[in-house]
Every structure is written in structure tokens, then in C-alpha cells.
A protein has these predicted regions:
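NTP/phosphate- and nucleic-acid-binding module
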Residues: 1-350
Length: 350
């Protein structure tokens, strides 16, 4: 409610449920947050990349997002020629679904995650151990099919932007890289005064079949995250069954003004996607080795983060983040020229 009153964002039924429209004032807040995190990423040696909003179904079959994540995705986009051919053959919707599931028909998917695209960027070059870690960052918009009854303001939407990054490193670099990621999440939260947070270590359920990969790799990933979270010196809980299908994760959980928990920043260790995509680098022994992948997003979803910030500050943002920092009010029309000059001077000063 407050966000709409402040003219930060809007929703429109003709655009679609859960698809936020950022208005100019909201855009200022979003840009300031992006500039803030980008400055930190530059200091830590990240490279910014840009990727498409869609990818071939085959990409997500390799990653496992299709079909493991299928219920949370928008339906696939089928190529026009294939649709025309199916129509001429009198195919039914059930036939189309079967053809997509078996891979007989290729299609595209609105990306539910940025990681497969970043993997392909990493894999587009020959890599040596001297190049690692490679840190790729993107403000990437992703799409999830949230049920209409679950949608709410900016905190539960169908289109959202992550301050996403993926680190490709050697096994020996994992611990240090995790610490860097956790430090960044903590800096984001403390800078914005969000001190009421908890930490959750999300692990696999060994009795479930929803996870991919070698159990030994899972054990290594969980051990690395457990060691890292213990170094934070904050209380944390372990949550079996809450891991992503490809790896365990550390979630930073923030309380809103009425005490509800919301997951924001996250750090994940992943031995499985490098295996599924057959990633490699040349080690000091001149042999091929498998990198480890770390997923991290300090804000999590920019939409959710801004939604919680609006409540946290009750609309009274700190000056650097406020959509309107200065208002010049000439006390008489004869001072209008001076007011315009002052406004120009302030704008040029940033």
C-alpha cells in the first residue's frame, strides 16, 4: 500500500498479475541499490555480464530446471514452424505436452534462473587454474509461475530481478569465496539497517529423490557451508529438505514490520551443475579438473528487497536512497531563475 501511495510502482491487469511496473521514483531507488552493489562488486573483482530472458529447453534439461522446476515455470514457448506443423497434423494439446517432454519438439523457456546462461559464458573460453576464480555478475530478470493466490505486492511476483552472480573456482578456493559472499550479504543488510535477520542452512533430505548429483559432492558442499555459517557467529538453524535441487545453501532471513520471515540474500555451493555441463579448467598438472560453482545474491529479489525496505523505513528512506532528496521552493516568482540555476547545480553535482 505504502509503495503505491509513494508512486513507486504499479500493477495493471492488462499487463498481468504479479508483473510489477516500476515508476520513475521507484526506478531511482532500484538504480541506487544497483549502483551500491555494483561498486562493491567492482572492488571484489566481479565482471558484469548480460544474458537473454529466454533459453532453449535443452539448456534447462541439461541443468535440471526442466523438469525438476517445471511446476514453477511459465509454459514453454514452441517455435512457430513446429506449431504450424502440429496444427496441420491435428495434434492436441496433450500431444504437444508429450512432444515437449520427450524432446521431440524444441522450444524456449522464460528463464527461471540465470545460472545456465552464466555457465555457458564460463564455458565459452579455455580456462586455466590461473584464471580462477571467475566471478560473473548480472542484474538478471527471471520468471516464476507463482499461483495467483500467492501473489502479494512486490514480495511475491512472477517477474523479478536478482543481483545474481556465479563464481567458478577451484575446490581449494571454495572456503575463501564463500566468506567473501557472506561478508557482502552482511554489508548490504547492515548498511540498510536491517539488523533483525537470521541465518538458515538449507540442506538436502537424503530420503527424497528431488535432488541431483553424487551424495559425496553433496556432503562436501554441506560441510563447506556449515563451516562458513559457523564463522558468522550468529545463531542459525539447519533445515533438511530446503536445499535447491542442485545444492545446499545459506539463506539470510529478514523479519518484516509484522514479524513475518522473508528470505533475501542467499549463498549456494554447487558441485552438480559443473558436472552436468561438463565444465573444466586446466590445472597446474596440465590436466582437466572440474570447477566448483558458487551461486550468490545479496539482495535476492530486488522487488522483494525494495518491498521490505519500504516497510522498514516507513517510506522515509535514507537520503542517498530517497527518490526525492531535495525540493527547491522559491518564495516568490522573481526567484524562479535562481531556483532553476540552483536545481541545475545540484543535479550536476549528483
Amino acid at each position: 500500500r505504502l509503495g503505491k501511495e509513494m508512486n513507486l510502482f504499479a500493477f495493471d491487469e492488462s499487463v498481468g498479475q504479479g508483473l510489477p511496473l516500476w515508476k520513475p521514483k521507484g526506478g531511482i531507488i532500484r538504480r541506487e541499490l544497483q549502483d551500491f552493489i555494483t561498486e562493491e562488486l567492482d572492488k571484489q573483482g566481479y565482471f558484469q555480464v548480460f544474458t537473454p530472458h529466454i533459453g532453449k529447453l535443452g539448456l534447462y534439461r541439461t541443468s535440471g530446471h526442466f523438469p525438476y522446476y517445471e511446476d514453477s515455470q511459465f509454459p514453454p514457448i514452441v517455435e512457430r514452424d513446429a506449431m504450424k506443423k502440429l496444427g496441420e497434423e491435428g495434434a492436441k494439446c496433450s500431444d504437444l505436452i508429450n512432444f515437449i517432454s520427450t524432446g521431440e519438439i524444441e522450444g524456449f523457456l522464460l528463464k527461471p534462473m540465470n545460472c545456465p546462461h552464466h555457465i555457458k559464458i564460463f564455458d565459452s573460453e579455455h580456462r586455466s587454474y590461473r584464471d580462477l576464480p571467475v566471478r560473473l555478475a548480472e542484474f538478471g530478470t527471471v520468471y516464476r509461475w507463482e499461483q495467483s493466490g500467492e501473489l502479494g505486492g512486490l514480495t511475491r511476483v512472477r517477474s523479478f530481478t536478482q543481483d545474481d552472480a556465479h563464481i567458478f573456482c577451484t575446490p581449494e578456493q571454495v572456503g575463501e569465496e564463500i566468506q567473501g559472499c557472506l561478508g557482502l550479504v552482511k554489508k548490504v543488510l547492515t548498511t540498510l539497517g536491517m539488523s533483525d535477520y537470521g541465518v538458515r542452512l538449507s540442506l538436502r533430505d537424503p530420503d527424497s529423490d528431488k535432488y541431483v548429483g553424487d551424495p559425496e559432492n553433496w556432503d562436501k558442499a554441506e560441510a563447506a557451508l556449515r563451516e562458513a555459517v559457523q564463522s558468522l557467529e550468529v545463531g542459525y538453524t539447519e533445515e533438511p529438505g530446503e536445499a535447491a535441487f542442485y545444492g545446499p545453501k545459506i539463506d539470510f532471513v529478514v523479519k518484516d514490520v509484522i514479524g513475518r520471515d522473508w528470505q533475501l540474500g542467499t549463498v549456494q555451493v554447487d558441485y552438480n551443475l559443473p558436472e552436468r555441463f561438463d565444465l573444466s579448467y586446466v590445472g597446474s598438472d596440465n590436466k582437466a579438473h572440474r570447477p566448483v560453482m558458487i551461486h550468490r545474491a545479496p539482495f535476492g529479489s530486488l522487488e522483494r528487497f525494495v518491498g521490505l525496505l519500504i516497510e522498514h523505513f516507513e517510506g522515509k528512506f535514507p537520503t542517498w536512497l530517497a527518490p526525492e532528496q531535495v525540493r527547491i521552493l522559491p518564495i516568490s516568482e522573481k526567484y524562479s531563475k535562481e531556483a532553476d540555476m540552483l536545481a541545475t547545480e545540484l543535479a550536476e553535482a549528483g
